[in-house]
From Swiss-Prot:
Residues 219-392 form the PCI domain. This is Eukaryotic translation initiation factor 3 subunit E-2. It comes from Drosophila willistoni. The keyword Acetylation does not apply. The lineage of its organism: Eukaryota, Metazoa, Ecdysozoa, Arthropoda, Hexapoda. Keywords: Cytoplasm, Initiation factor, Protein biosynthesis.
């Protein structure tokens, strides 16, 4: 189903190393020609210092089993450069126990003073640590790279020319080592920096667009990610604007998060509005499923789209792990919406709408009732499901109000900030005439 594959688009906004898991995932699918895909991986990995990965890819392409002379020479150069960089950092290598102990690095000023006093630390050592961290990352040694990147974050001033690069590098390395808790902390730190930095409008938009794509990797792997992706993508106007302007395809991941997050059903109304606004620029089976169900009340269309959704999710690296949960919650959405219209439903009709056999549908409904997620009764003799009322809980009402107020507050804050910048710019421009 290459028609709905977003890998090519997503890779444009990811670091080269972050694309490898996506490309390797596609190798296990039958969407693209395997030979061409492996050739692209080889072309990409050749731009890094991961010589072993390069050789492995060559073998998969049935190229030479022996390492070419060019790669032998390049590997020697990589090892030599790595040793040189490690020698440059040698004066602070004695402090490796401090590097690995994050607790002792909380206070930046105290830490720098201790380094200068005990290890004769100089600021040129900081640049050496930055170069080594970057080189280790290029070699695929992400774990060791994170130690030096963290060191740079503690010692480096936020106005340093390399500070933003360190933030991005640290986030990428934590993602690639699957350290999701730390990755979320780095994501938050980077977002705060971007939102407070004095970027031009275009630069800020570009930075947020990249961050949106990287954050999807974190959100769908962190326990709190399903709430956080909704808050960031739907209720932070600056990021929602970036999605609508630069990357409407991200609606797929926002929609998926809302579907599988039963505690955030209040977000559906706002999500549907955005989906309708962007339907002329981006559509896929997941967004169309929600349109069929909540805009057109087309249950047959929703049933068919749900079947397509399964294929789309199965072939999407970001959300493949959510497949079973998505199908279960999507069926529940169909069921709940159908029940709002029909108070009494036959099990056979319901089974047809849910793509299930009648006995499977009955067991499914029984489990919903048993788990206190559904106020209904089953008449087994007549084969009917009789619905009770489904009031919105006070908690859900409160969350809905808070989200609405939060979104309005952020929108007003953004408006005030833009007007302030415009006023300052006009003031600066007026000096040009004197």
């Amino acid at each position: 189903m290459a028609q709905f594959d977003l890998t090519r688009i997503n890779c444009q906004y990811l670091d080269r190393h972050l694309t490898f898991p996506l490309l390797e995932f596609l190798c296990g699918k039958e969407i693209y020609n395997q030979q061409e895909l492996l050739e692209y991986i080889l072309e990409t990995v050749n731009k890094t210092n991961m010589i072993d990965y390069t050789m492995d890819t060559r073998k998969r392409l049935n190229l030479s089993q022996e390492m070419p002379e060019e790669l032998v020479q390049r590997k020697a150069e990589v090892l030599a450069t790595l040793k040189q960089l490690q020698n440059e950092v040698a004066p602070i290598m004695k402090a490796t126990d401090i590097l690995k102990n994050g607790e002792s690095m909380k206070d930046s000023k105290t830490f720098v003073n201790a380094l200068q006093k005990d290890y004769n630390f100089k600021m040129e050592h900081l640049y050496s640590a930055y170069k080594l961290a970057k080189y280790l990352y290029e070699c695929g040694n992400y774990q060791e790279s994170t130690s030096y990147l963290y060191f740079c974050l503690i010692v480096m001033a936020p106005n340093d020319k390399n500070y933003l690069n360190v933030l991005w590098g640290k986030l990428a390395a934590e993602i690639l080592t699957l350290n999701w808790n730390t990755a979320l902390e780095d994501l938050t730190r980077l977002r705060d920096y971007i939102d407070s930095a004095n970027f031009s409008t275009i630069q800020a938009l570009q930075q947020r667009t990249w961050l949106i794509h990287w954050s999807v990797l974190v959100f769908f792997n962190h326990p709190k990610g399903r709430d956080l992706i909704i808050e960031m993508f739907l209720y932070k106007p600056l990021y929602l604007n970036a999605i609508q302007t630069m990357c409407p395809h991200i609606m797929r991941y926002l929609a998926t998060a809302v579907v599988i997050n039963r505690t955030r059903r209040n977000a559906l109304k706002d999500l549907i509005k955005v989906i309708q606004q962007e339907s002329y620029t981006y559509r896929d089976p997941i967004t169309e499923f929600l349109e069929c169900l909540y805009v057109n009340f087309d249950f047959e269309g929703a049933r068919l789209k749900l079947h397509e959704c399964q294929t789309v999710i199965l072939n999407d690296f970001f959300i493949v792990a959510c497949l079973n949960e998505f199908v279960e919650d999507a069926r529940l959405m169909i069921f709940e919406t159908f029940c709002r219209i029909h108070q009494c439903i036959t099990i056979s009709m319901l089974a047809d709408k849910l793509n299930m056999k009648p006995n499977e549908a009955e067991c499914w409904i029984v489990n919903l009732i048993r788990n206190a997620r559904l106020n209904a009764k089953i008449d087994s003799k007549l084969g009917h499901v009789v619905m009770g009322t489904q009031p919105l809980s006070p908690y859900q009402q409160l969350v809905e109000k808070i989200d609405s107020l939060s979104m309005r507050s952020e929108h007003l804050a953004g408006l005030i900030e833009r007007k302030s910048k415009q006023k300052n710019q006009e003031s600066i421009d007026s000096w040009k005439y004197y």
